[in-house]
Amino acid sequence: MIFQELNKFNNVVFTEEGHTYTLNGEPLTSVTTFIGKFKKPFMRDFWADKTAQKENTTREEILNKWDSITVRACNKGSKLHAYAENYINNKILPNTIYDFNIDNEAYTKIESHFLEFYEESKKNLIPISSELCVGSSALGLCGMVDQLYYSDTLGGLVIFDWKTNKKMNYKSKFQNKMLEPVSHLDECEFT
């Protein structure tokens, strides 16, 4: 029954280059892009100038530093996603098939947390699908489910989204809110 329902998503295609989704050949908006429409744009140059002044350096150095942090964070996330998908699906060499420029000590902690979760979750979560592309032509949205499980405890499906953020803030530390019509929500990692 579950797998028959998941067949609805067989025509959702994710293209890594350009990070785009299509459903039956029609381009759709990613959920991440959609959510981004309700966030205030980050004033990169303004804040780079402020930070450069505070740290007694140049805007270019700050921008390069931020870009480097972003690349490493994305690589760390990609590595965990690949590791989790391979591990859950019993693929043998999840750590050696990708070359990532990341802080290995920090990543090792993340991997360790995943393995703890995996061992604990085997008691009541049954893996259904990893990196599952989903979408709705009615909503015009597509996205990727990192891991779909069936929960014995809940008697239904549970969606997991692997996170490697340094912090997971549930509130905005600057009291920033999302834009209308979701302005009641804090702008933070949790939203």
Map each language-model feature to its residues.
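Charged, glycine-rich intrinsically disordered N-terminal tails and low-complexity linkers that flank
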Residues: 1-79
